[in-house]
Amino acid sequence: MQKLLGLMRRCIDDYDMIRENDRIAVGVSGGKDSLVLLQLLAELRKFFNKPFALEAITIDMGLGMDYSGIAALCEKLDVPFHLIKTEIGPIIFEHRKEKNPCSLCSKMRRGALNQAILDLGFNKLALGHHYDDAVETFVMSLIYEGRISCFQPVTDLDRTGIIQIRPMLYIHEKTVDNFAKRMELPVVENRCPVDKSTKREEIKQLIFDLSQTYPDLKERIFGAMQRFPLPEWEPHGRYKRPKEQE
């Protein structure tokens, strides 16, 4: 855990993600990424030099998923847990019968999450995007939209006053996977009908295939995003790429 905390601490410091007395909500979907983020932030809270409040929010899509494991983990970590019930799943798959539901689903989930954050009085939302997510998003934007773009480490949502932070951007996906298994985190089974059949999965496979020939591909892309840099991607400290992790 110390290695992951070190990478997270460096990312937080590089982008000034956490300030004193922040009220941070972790968006917990039930997937491994958000659960690892929750575990690490709960641990970081114990010794970080800037005190901050931490709570967890889960948006229940109305697809019959069991979130009791998340509630138990939050109790163990002494992190208040908020389960926000919605009918997003039935609206998309039963009423609207969307053929390409991912975009609408994402917008509706973001809307529900942002509203919950405002209602509960948080000023920051921590999201579980990791190193590989950033690389995949960059390649997706290039291939599907013809844009040099990616989400930002810190995003200020002007209309709401919410600031999104992504503290795990220096942590590789396989490191997240291994940590989640080692800690036996309560990953929730995803009952989305289109899970694993998205454009992101296609790009993930493409990057994997290219990496067999170009082993440093992901590191080159991530480094270019910081050195170019993309908007808001230039770190405050001297860039030192995250090395391959166990």
Task: Report each predicted region and the residues it spans.
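Residue-level detector of flexible, active-site-proximal loop/helix-junction positions
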Residues: 61-63, 88-90, 155-158, 171, ...
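Charged/polar, solvent-exposed surface patches and flexible loops
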Residues: 6, 10, 14, 72, ...
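Catalytic subdomain that performs nucleotidyl-dependent activation
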Residues: 53-54, 132-212
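Short, basic, helix/turn surface patches
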Residues: 106-120, 154-160, 207, 211-226
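Mobile, glycine- and charge-enriched loop segments
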Residues: 79-100, 162, 224, 231-244
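The feature marks non-catalytic terminal segments
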Residues: 185-246
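ATP-dependent adenylation/nucleotidyltransferase module used to activate substrates
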Residues: 1-136, 144, 174-182
